[in-house]
Amino acid sequence: MATFELYRRSTIGMCLTETLDEMVQSGTLSPELAIQVLVQFDKSMTEALESQVKTKVSIKGHLHTYRFCDNVWTFILQDAMFKSDDRQENVSRVKIVACDSKLLTQ
């Protein structure tokens, strides 16, 4: 299964990358193994989001910027509101990156 490396830019992905870098620098982990861990992280995040997340959320906000490049949409919203069945969250700025899932099956 092919995966995107999108989730490496999430908070948990950046923490994992930083920790792996520290382990490689200290000699605790080989660079090859660190890469394998990141590839597995990409696969695990994709599988978890496909199978475990069932909540639907609506998003409203002011579109500041949008871009479409290499089959990837990027939207930057300002004063966005995320609303689910039981909760509402307001954020001043959010970046949404969306990829065509058909690319994963190629």
Curated annotation (Swiss-Prot):
Signal peptide stretch: none
An example Gene Ontology biological process: transcription initiation at RNA polymerase II promoter
Domain of life: Eukaryota
Pfam families named among the record's database cross-references: TFIIA_gamma_C, TFIIA_gamma_N
Listed InterPro entries: TFIIA_a-hlx, TFIIA_b-brl, TFIIA_gsu, TFIIA_gsu_C, TFIIA_gsu_N
Presence of the UniProt keyword Transcription regulation in the record: yes
Disulfide bonds: none
One GO CC term, this protein: transcription factor TFIIA complex
Annotated compartments: Nucleus
Keywords per UniProt: Nucleus, Transcription, Transcription regulation
Keyword Phosphoprotein: no
Subunit text: TFIIA is a heterodimer of the large unprocessed subunit 1 and a small subunit gamma. It was originally believed to be a heterotrimer of an alpha, a beta and a gamma subunit.
Family: Belongs to the TFIIA subunit 2 family.
Known role: TFIIA is a component of the transcription machinery of RNA polymerase II and plays an important role in transcriptional activation. TFIIA in a complex with TBP mediates transcriptional activity.
Name by which UniProt lists this protein: Transcription initiation factor IIA subunit 2
Organism: Arabidopsis thaliana
